[in-house]
From Swiss-Prot:
Protein's GO biological process: animal organ development; cell differentiation; fibroblast growth factor receptor signaling pathway; positive regulation of cell differentiation; positive regulation of cell population proliferation; positive regulation of macromolecule metabolic process; positive regulation of MAPK cascade; regulation of primary metabolic process
Record-linked CDD domains: IgI_1_FGFR, IgI_2_FGFR, PTKc_FGFR1
Matches recorded under InterPro entries: FGF_rcpt_1, FGF_rcpt_fam, Ig-like_dom, Ig-like_dom_sf, Ig-like_fold, Ig_I-set, Ig_sub, Ig_sub2
Identification of the protein by name: Fibroblast growth factor receptor 1
Primary gene name: fgfr1
Domain Protein kinase: 472-761
Domain comment quoted from the record: The second and third Ig-like domains directly interact with fibroblast growth factors (FGF) and heparan sulfate proteoglycans. Isoforms lacking the first Ig-like domain have higher affinity for fibroblast growth factors (FGF) and heparan sulfate proteoglycans than isoforms with all three Ig-like domains.
MF terms in GO: ATP binding; fibroblast growth factor binding; fibroblast growth factor receptor activity
Amino acid sequence: MFSGMSLLLWGVLLGAALSVARPPSTLPDEVAPKTKTEVEPYSAQPGDRITLQCRLREDVQSINWVKNGVQLSETNRTRITGEEIQISNAGPEDNGVYACVTNGPSRTYTVLCSVNVSDALPSAEDDDEDDDNSSSEEKAAENSKPNRPLWSHPEKMEKKLHAVPAAKTVKFRCPANGTPTPTLRWLKNNRAFQQDQRIGGYKVRSQTWSLIMDSVVPSDKGNYTCIVENKYGAINHTYQLDVVERSPHRPILQAGLPANTSVTVGTTAEFSCKVYSDPQPHIQWLRHIEINGSRVASDGFPYVEILKTAGVNTSDKDMEVLHLRNVTFEDAGQYTCLAANSIGISHHSAWLTVLKVEDNKPALLASPLQLEIIIYCTGAAFVSAMVVTIIIFKMKHPSKKSDFNSQLAVHKLAKSIPVRRQVTVSGDSSSSMNSGVILVRRLSSSGTPMLSGLSEYELPEDPRWEVARDRLILGKPLGEGCFGQVVMAEAIGLDKEKPNKVTKVAVKMLKSDASEKDLSDLISEMEMMKMIGKHKNIINLLGACTQDGPLYVIVEYTSKGNLREYLRARRPPAMEYCYNPTCVPDQLLSFKDLVSCAYQVARGMDYLASKKCIHRDLAARNVLVTEDNIMKIADFGLARDIHHIDYYKKTTNGRLPVKWMAPEALFDRIYTHQSDVWSFGVLLWEIFTLGGSPYPGVPMEELFKLLKEGHRMDKPTNCTNELYMMMKDCWHAMPSQRPTFNQLVEDLDRILALSSNQEYLDLSMPVNQYSPCFPDTRSSTCSSGEDSMFSHDPLPDEPCLPKYSNGGLKKR
């Protein structure tokens, strides 16, 4: 306790000392009093999205954007929204000086941004400061007498072990000279290092004696030996590379931040909060407030108010600083920085003290030494008070933890969700103990049911989403999901303006043998859907029943099932099902219909990406279709345990959709928006084969080898070359070279606008062609519908499709 308190105290005192020592910022005398100019550099890579923001002052009356002295206007790549400008798919033509001119009543502010878009990816450039030195040494060596190779900078090669996190760029250098000029080659683990040994290859810069590997993964671990040789001799040097895989954890907040702050009335207070998180964090700033004269509710948890929360256009750097302008005495109090990700929640608090404006009489001015002493003592007093308060609070409430309900403007602070169930008391005890409180915690990967007979639990009520149970009429079951079952239902009065309107909905609920982990996952999915918000092309949360009974999560109902079965049910007669060859679909799909499906899914994924949500299981089976043929992405809020699943065994915890997974996700478990783009490419292939199974006839073990060798699925018969190129772009080996969902939306929107409604599909050709032919080792039972490498058994409703090879029927 003493050690932790000392660290906090030193953090506060150091921050105070720095603030005292910092000189005031003033403009040079030669700058006109009515104009202020700031210059900010901005670097980007080709294909990036450039976002420039103008920091607004309170007295700003108008904003103008200028590039190289010319007024900027919106184009198909440039979007201007007041204080912000966005340029998509950046290129060298976007280089220049951008000026944001804001006019106020007393002065004009001009912010200059010098934008530089490089001509090549940074990984292809070598910016080593020793390049020129190496070149000059080589020239000097060429003019000298013949000699064997020698290291030119051995002191820079002393560090042999390099431990770097995954996805970083690694560069090894072996600078040498000799006459004649030596040659350079590299070994990995004492064997020749070939380009095809790693996804994306590597680069050798002979002129700088360097080896460059972009986006390293755990499989890149090993010993790398450079051999420099000429006809007079050879030398070598070995580096050891250790790639540290990033383990998921809740956000880590820098110790001592935010720090206690003291300001005078009318000035600006600033709190900083440095957040470290591998999964994308969601950051909020909260202020502790009083309700009915009390800062603490009856259950012992304090009340808080949300001051600042992350939005679509806010960066993490913006969220790490809280500015309180023109502070008053009412602003004094406790402030909290809250950071949450998919793993958990962390928070730090600090106090704001508001002081009176000091009299300007010289006799009353404190010396710098006195001011430092006052700040140190004040900081020590507040830290001591805070530590004592925490100790007393924990002694009185040993079993309670803290968490934040981030969706309420004023709400209680709680760390985990209390779940109440009946408890049997044995013996003759007369205690009134008829219920116990169970805290929902993450279980081990076994997921053993812990709440058998769960009948009642208690969650904080959210008025924005709460639906009365008597307004919900449950109907027939629709199926079983990850957490329990899904049933059809009718909800009355979901639309507040139409209290008697009946809406058909789907309701997710727990099974009778639900575990604590199941409950935690269902609550996490519900909270994720609240946080992400609503969009036309995702399954939206409509409400929830959290009080006086089991948890019901109410979502939109989709009458036409998932996209995979939707497409298969609309195959033309030329692709008849083996069990019903006379079946004729009610509706034939045109080329434009299929492009529309892809366009809608891309729009939904673009929205999820803007909310910093990574799906990790995008496939046609997870896209649902409404009565009006609207595509809606489902299961984006599921908590998936992807780090403890054996790739070669079916487990009770889950199944990996390997046929839809990007190589970096499959081999190194790196999940990003770019890995979702790979899955979207497979979904495109599913759409244009009307629900075909990816990589048909390819065994899972062979699939891994094919992906590493760069093989990709062939173009579907009724797919245009442009759309097939889009698929192949999504399947690029380098994640950074894949298109973004925003770019995919723009391209599909253009293709959709040029499509004709009359282009009905001729699917007399096979849909399951794939260039590497493999014998079908399975029985004649149809099994083309496998969702993952674990499933080799046919689905009960799977249609048996004819097997083709090179345009002809393939013998079984």
